[in-house]
Amino acid sequence: MPIDNLPPLREVIDIYGLQAHKSLGQNFLFDLNLTSKIAHQAGNIEGKPVIEVGPGPGGLTRALLAKGALVIAIERDERCIPALLAIEKHYPKKLKLICNDALKQNFSKLFETYPEKPRIIANLPYNIGTQLLLNWLLVEPWPPFYESMTLMFQREVAKRITAKPQSAYYGRLSVLTGWRTTAKIAFDVPPQAFIPAPKITSSVVHIIPRIQPLTCSAQKLSFVTKTAFGQRRKMLRQNLKTLGGEMLLAKAGIDGTRRAETLSISEFVTLANLVI
């Protein structure tokens, strides 16, 4: 059943000549049943502000608007703007378009005058998805400018985001995500839901900020985790040599022969708090 009376997305892509560009990490999501499922995963968004990054031809945008959201869509690719303007005309005063690179967008400033925090709901471009997430995880002040994030990533990235200690996917991204938020994989999205179809499965991850994460400098924790996971197979006393090595680990009560993937988030926080 159609969510609106706008043309089907395949038709929109043809009308505006929107071939996905690999250089922009684009894979257009055209299955409107799935876009509605993503919008539903974010909870009740009627009358709520929503940030969407990389809307492309507007498949997810339409699902968000159909559920009553007030959408602020940030799109770098100017080719997509005419298709998005057609959606804006269909939903007057419900869609705001910003033509900008999301990596350069000051999100905190954009929403400082809004009466309530936005939710971030997006099928993120593959080539900038991880960096955008890191930017949003490390933003200051905390609690952040957003209420929650419902984001699509490559399945492997989603596993890294939600991984636990002692697992192959556990790494810097897992620690930084788990420190400040709770995250879960909501569902998978098959390749055939996209144009063009990628070679891998994607996953939607739902992320909610912790109001009071363990006290720690975001910059220090980011640096310590980057250093600790620099060479995964090496012992911590080797990887953390430049930060104090055995002495630092002894202060933290951590065995220097352990590897980074065995440490809990709280142990990483302890290390970061000891770094001068």
From Swiss-Prot:
Q: Which compartments does it reside in?
A: Cytoplasm
Q: List residues traversing the bilayer.
A: none
Q: Which GO terms describe its cellular component?
A: cytosol
The record's annotation in InterPro entries points to: KsgA/Erm, rRNA_Ade_diMease-like_C, rRNA_Ade_Mease_Trfase_CS, rRNA_Ade_methylase_Trfase_N, rRNA_adenine_dimethylase, SAM-dependent_MTases_sf
UniProt xrefs under PROSITE patterns: RRNA_A_DIMETH (PS01131), SAM_RNA_A_N6_MT (PS51689)
What EC identifiers does the entry list? 2.1.1.182
Keyword tags: Cytoplasm, Methyltransferase, RNA-binding, rRNA processing, S-adenosyl-L-methionine, Transferase
User: Which Pfam families does this entry report, sorted A to Z?
Assistant: RrnaAD
What is the superkingdom listed in this entry's lineage? Bacteria
The record ties this protein, via Gene3D superfamilies, to: Ribosomal RNA adenine dimethylase-like, domain 2, Vaccinia Virus protein VP39
Q: Provide the top EC class.
A: transferase
Q: Name one GO molecular function term.
A: RNA binding
Catalysed reactions, semicolon-separated = adenosine(1518)/adenosine(1519) in 16S rRNA + 4 S-adenosyl-L-methionine = N(6)-dimethyladenosine(1518)/N(6)-dimethyladenosine(1519) in 16S rRNA + 4 S-adenosyl-L-homocysteine + 4 H(+)
Per UniProt, where does S-adenosyl-L-methionine bind?
A: 27, 29, 54, 75, 101, 123
Q: What does this protein do?
A: Specifically dimethylates two adjacent adenosines (A1518 and A1519) in the loop of a conserved hairpin near the 3'-end of 16S rRNA in the 30S particle. May play a critical role in biogenesis of 30S subunits.
* HAMAP family attached to this UniProt entry: 16SrRNA_methyltr_A (MF_00607)
So what family is this one in? Answer: Belongs to the class I-like SAM-binding methyltransferase superfamily. rRNA adenine N(6)-methyltransferase family. RsmA subfamily.
- In Swiss-Prot or TrEMBL terms, this protein is called Ribosomal RNA small subunit methyltransferase A
Which organism was this protein described from?
Bartonella quintana (strain Toulouse) (Rochalimaea quintana)
